[in-house]
Amino acid sequence: MKFIAELCQNHNGNFDTVRRMVDEAAEGGASHVKIQHIYARNLIYRPEFEEGLEQNGETKAIRRPWQPEYDRLKGLELSEDECARFVEYVESVGLVPMTTCFARGDVERIAQQGFRTIKVASYDCASFPMLRELAQRFDYLYVSTGATFDDELRHAADVLRKHAKGYSLLHCVTQYPTPLDAMHLNRIGWLSQYADEVGFSDHSLVSRDGMVAAKAAVACGAEVVERHFTISDPSETKDGPVSITKEHIRSLIDFSRLSRADQRAQLTEEHPGWEEMLGKAERWLSDTELLNRDYYRGRFATPRREGANRLAEMVLNWEETPL
């Protein structure tokens, strides 16, 4: 089993913390360590999210004002030099360095920093121009699928089959944190018709659920598991509550070495009723997932000029516009 330790912004923009996180992920048994190429300069100003929208007591758009989000992201950025040093350091401890690309304009920059393995967030699974460019430029893609409609996923798989040197599809649920009864882990087997390797990106609440969702995913055939990773107290970072430690990684890897029958027996003994996580292989996105998709899909784009942040001045990841 491959384990991707997702550092996200749990490093708080501090490269010394990044290196310590890499060390602990390696000690836990991770195979991959991932950062995110999130840059405030790529954040689009969209008026509908400044105050959010409620109609007849129903949320139509979440509230996420641009300026506070810009300021927050700006303080979490790693420099280009630090990203290149991240690649070198992860490789020096024998693991695979990864990053998530959030804007088409960053593809070449990421390649120049030495990355060869890329994660595509589920909100960009249907950003077909960027997906194609990433597939052509890098050696391997891990593509999350949680916020993607089935017709979009089928087309994404066609793009990957045609252009990618290698790829995996990851099931996830874009609800943070994800309740166990909303996991729909049967989706993992369903994804195997579109990829030779499938996996799971887990967003469950660690303090409540531990590693049960990830273990159940492995018992359902996940060959890759991705989880947010931290060395800090969960209260210190935005993603802390859904982030695990090296001890959690070890427990999952030990579990993955059991036979499938023993895995299910352990789940039944330690987590009676775990089958509630299986859910449906084919399903519609929940209202919460649709609201998150509405905000996060199109959150980042490539500015047409320095300092631009309005929609008309940005190239979206799903636009065929040449950069």
Language model features: what each stretch is:
Residues 1-323:
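Catalytic cores and adjacent flexible loops of soluble metabolic enzymes
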